[in-house]
Amino acid sequence: MTELKNDRYLRALLRQPVDVTPVWMMRRAGRYLPEYKATRAQAGDFMSLCKNAELACEVTLQPLRRYPLDAAILFSDILTIPDAMGLGLYFEAGEGPRFTAPVTCKADVEKLPIPDPEGELGYVMNAVRTIRRELKGEVPLIGFSGSPWTLATYMVEGGSSKAFTVIKKMMYADPQALHLLLDKLAKSVTLYLNAQIKAGAQSVMIFDTWGGVLTGRDYQQFSLYYMHKIVDGLLRENDGRRVPVTLFTKGGGQWLEAMAETGCDALGLDWTTDIADARRRVGHKVALQGNMDPSMLYAPPARIEDEVATILAGFGQGEGHVFNLGHGIHQDVPPEHAGAFVEAVHRLSAQYHN
């Protein structure tokens, strides 16, 4: 077991004392960094980059060379599981991910395999092992997966969607087929995340990017229920340490109490939720991650610093806050603005920790 030199992030997730508020950024390996663009060009395309352990490791480490971040997150994609199920993932210029064989009916669902994390998804585990080795205990490594509902939206819609009419048609016209798909995905995600933990991920996060498009009742039945099943099935200790679990539903600020009942350690917040309100509601039960609007990084550094100060003051004194953006960093943000953000979090947060 490599001794962690900086365990602030893991401690904050477990609501333990820290010296300053830890910070990392979602999608922080990405197109806003010139070094990422160079590595992606070397790989040829996005999935080739994900499937090459050495290059995936390189782009995971790039932001850490620029910024004093408190955690690294595996460079991968949420659609690795549907890809491993044989749906034919490809990326259309300007349109994002697409599938050649989307799921259209119950018969399609029944044919889907549950992928072997060390087989079809072995390239992800190789990347986790490579990154852990190269991190040399500097900061913890976060593993992740999409939620069953979010993965299902891409699989049924055939790619990205604005209105989600195809999956909602299945949800209301053939709920049995959708539940079968979500159950299969929950089993797949549980196996996948546990394999990441065994390979070296020290914390895991479930991204429910599209849970917020559901009604409250549908969210409980079609998204949260399956995330709860996953949390129940996860390894919560490895290598002598607790492995914290974070749930993040974009647009899910109205359901924090229900999310906190799943047994997760932390909840991710998007920028539409007031962090002071969130702490009042669930801070006694879970840590909170977030939640600056990613577009704030277009502002001058002084304005970014003001926003960081406001969010820190909103959370207030004490433990259980991991600073992050409310979603992924945008691809055309000036890298020096991201640096100003990270520096401001560390400098301004010390006063909130005794």
UniProtKB/Swiss-Prot annotation:
Name of the gene this protein is made from: hemE
Assigned EC number: 4.1.1.37
Species for this entry: Salmonella typhimurium (strain LT2 / SGSC1412 / ATCC 700720)
Name of the featured protein: Uroporphyrinogen decarboxylase
Pathway(s) annotated for this protein in UniProt: Porphyrin-containing compound metabolism; protoporphyrin-IX biosynthesis; coproporphyrinogen-III from 5-aminolevulinate: step 4/4
Any single GO CC term annotated in Swiss-Prot or TrEMBL for this entry: cytosol
Catalytic activity: uroporphyrinogen III + 4 H(+) = coproporphyrinogen III + 4 CO2
Residues carrying the site annotation Transition state stabilizer: 77
CDD domains: URO-D (cd00717)
Molecular function terms, GO-annotated: uroporphyrinogen decarboxylase activity
Chief place where the protein resides: cytoplasm
GO biological process terms held by the UniProt record: heme biosynthetic process; protoporphyrinogen IX biosynthetic process from glutamate
Assigned protein family: Belongs to the uroporphyrinogen decarboxylase family.
NCBIfam families cross-referenced by the UniProt entry: hemE (TIGR01464)
Enzyme kind, highest EC tier: lyase
Keywords: Cytoplasm, Decarboxylase, Lyase, Porphyrin biosynthesis
